[in-house]
Amino acid sequence: MGSASEQRVTLTNADKVLYPATGTTKSDIFDYYAGVAEVMLGHIAGRPATRKRWPNGVDQPAFFEKQLALSAPPWLSRATVAHRSGTTTYPIIDSATGLAWIAQQAALEVHVPQWRFVAEPGSGELNPGPATRLVFDLDPGEGVMMAQLAEVARAVRDLLADIGLVTFPVTSGSKGLHLYTPLDEPVSSRGATVLAKRVAQRLEQAMPALVTSTMTKSLRAGKVFVDWSQNSGSKTTIAPYSLRGRTHPTVAAPRTWAELDDPALRQLSYDEVLTRIARDGDLLERLDADAPVADRLTRYRRMRDASKTPEPIPTAKPVTGDGNTFVIQEHHARRPHYDFRLECDGVLVSWAVPKNLPDNTSVNHLAIHTEDHPLEYATFEGAIPSGEYGAGKVIIWDSGTYDTEKFHDDPHTGEVIVNLHGGRISGRYALIRTNGDRWLAHRLKNQKDQKVFEFDNLAPMLATHGTVAGLKASQWAFEGKWDGYRLLVEADHGAVRLRSRSGRDVTAEYPQLRALAEDLADHHVVLDGEAVVLDSSGVPSFSQMQNRGRDTRVEFWAFDLLYLDGRALLGTRYQDRRKLLETLANATSLTVPELLPGDGAQAFACSRKHGWEGVIAKRRDSRYQPGRRCASWVKDKHWNTQEVVIGGWRAGEGGRSSGVGSLLMGIPGPGGLQFAGRVGTGLSERELANLKEMLAPLHTDESPFDVPLPARDAKGITYVKPALVAEVRYSEWTPEGRLRQSSWRGLRPDKKPSEVVRE
């Protein structure tokens, strides 16, 4: 079979509308499956793919297709399964081009089992293997809402956690939720089914009013059916990232557990999923970590004879890595050209560039995408004999390392942006696929000259909420989470500017930090960090930060370096930015707190011991992504906090009867604020008086909440425009979406209402 590099799929009827309600075309579907290939393939590779096709659109009849048609392209991987009624040959989708073929077939849905094919020793014949994961399909009965599904999902997660298994949630794209659990050791499909059934039955016993494990539909009204049967070797489940053939183009979308706590949880559309992937990557990355990887050197080997050419021809499959070397080789072949190669995932991704990379931004040069080369080729120089592929002399013209801004080298949506650091050539380059294997190479302006890094437009990178206990120090660095205000700082040879997380210039609000200008007078830097006020124990205090005066000692604790003396560092790995930051601190009086010791669990314990707010874990290889909340940064706090928007207030009783007694809290949603309860605990008399003064000009007769408030909460309320952001502590979210046992922490003038999301 041909390698993925040789495969070609021609899209026909590109403008055919497959989702009439949204006008989504076949071309849109083609682009979607090309866009999700990198994250989806690991979850379907090695598994037989059953397709559900809507050739005439979702408003017309569909049909399931298991048997691979004789007209299918020969390069598609395939294997045969014996059924009672005969044998069926299934396609195995293990390449981006295979997914493109799926789209060309208008096979909107891809269904796979929980087992993979395994090769028989000796013969190499593929046969069904053991299950590598569990799946639970949470199917809502009549009247069941998403919040109830999420409640059951958390119960399943907790049961599996008791036996040492981790669970990942997926909104199905239809009505329900899917839960996936990777198995440390594969088990038979029968064994997986037995385990899943026991979990479902145990859940039914614990939650009889909400859960059923029985397939009888008449028993499902008002309950969640925990379908365990899809672990059977003969059954399939809609694959993660697959489209659904419904009225709208929804997707079986991986979610975070924090999202399942959101009462507004809903199914996601394909365009939303693409945005999430660009921001967060694959949320199911740990589900199929052992997925089979295609040998990317198959085509390279087939084009060469080791007995006739001095080129390196390794026999082993390449091992995926995170190296970042590049090489440009001058190739005196029949048509002289330069070969540009970038190390990626264990191979050298390669282009033949007739005129070499351009040396200015005003021209584009043609680049032909060629077969992947082995890493050993990066040091190859020599003469390829006449009559052999690529005959001619090869000389290394330049080599070095590169930073990645974007790397999509698939045959359909290719775009690569890198920053080269070589001896003869340096700078930012983009390679963009135009048609087939034809790409354009373009030199970009240096990132420091781009608008994206203008300090006034820079937004801080944000962390996702999660647990750090299972994270290892070999891959993650652990910082303390400080109880202060996030600041971006620009110090430029004696001048300093400060910006809040929301983008406000707050230089005048922190006269105590003017000393940074003198400390960093020899440099032009942009720093990310936290402004803190320490209590008598030397611990950052949020309340003292809130009530600081001009004479209060405010410190700036830096934890990231984004720009240094003419070089933008956004595309540089965290561990390298950290080294530069520590070097800068050693040469100045800049405060850079030390990293926490050990793995995640030890770091979290250290943070608790010192009375800090929590821990921020950062992948050592992560790049800085301005304004994005990314899974490569994880925050884990010792107590629950939530930012809220104030939507109204109620007068107090007794000594508070003339002023504010409690505040109405909300979380911004599409139709207004989603009511999150009231808070009065923790407010001092001084704060109450200040709040009354601040809220007076915001008075409105219209409720800012998306639905009418319950009578007990609406009584005696004065509504205000949703302009002020505050932070509260709480014990838990109730099923109704209220904060239980909330207590006031303070206003957050550094935050905009539009930034507030449910944690």
From Swiss-Prot:
Residues 460-757 are annotated as: Ligase domain (Lig). Mn(2+) 2 binds at residues 137, 139, 227. Residues 740-759 are annotated as: Disordered. Substrate binds at residues 52, 111, 137-139, 172-178, 230, 236, 244. Residues 1-411 are annotated as: Not required for ligase activity. The active site is at 481 (n6-amp-lysine intermediate). Changing residue 230 to A: Wild-type filling on single nt gaps, impaired gap filling on more complicated templates (in Pol domain). Residues 297-446 are annotated as: 3-phosphoesterase domain (PE). Pfam families: DNA_ligase_A_C (PF04679), DNA_ligase_A_M (PF01068), LigD_N (PF13298), LigD_Prim-Pol (PF21686). Changing residue 53 to A: On substrate with 5'-phosphate, 1 base pair (bp) complementarity and 1 nucleotide (nt) gap, greatly reduced DNA-binding and gap-filling. Barely detectable activity on substrate with high complementarity and 3'-overhang (in Pol domain). Binds 4 Mn(2+); 2 Mn(2+) for polymerase/primase activity, 1 each for 3-phosphoesterase and ligase. Changing residue 373 to A: Loss of exonuclease, no DNA repair. It catalyses: ATP + (deoxyribonucleotide)n-3'-hydroxyl + 5'-phospho-(deoxyribonucleotide)m = (deoxyribonucleotide)n+m + AMP + diphosphate. Mn(2+) 1 binds at residues 137, 139. Monomer. Component of the NHEJ repair enzyme with mKu. Interacts with Ku in the absence of DSB via the Pol domain. In structures of the Pol domain with template DNA 2 Pol domains are bound to microhomologous DNA complexes to form an end-bridging complex. Probably interacts with Mycobacterium phage Omega and Corndog Ku homologs (AC Q853W0, AC Q856K7). Interacts with Sir2; may form a trimeric complex with LigD during NHEJ. The N-terminal Mn(2+)-dependent polymerase/primase domain (Pol) functions as an independent domain, binds DNA, is sufficient for DNA-directed and non-DNA-directed DNA synthesis and interacts with Ku. This is Multifunctional non-homologous end joining DNA repair protein LigD. The gene is ligD.
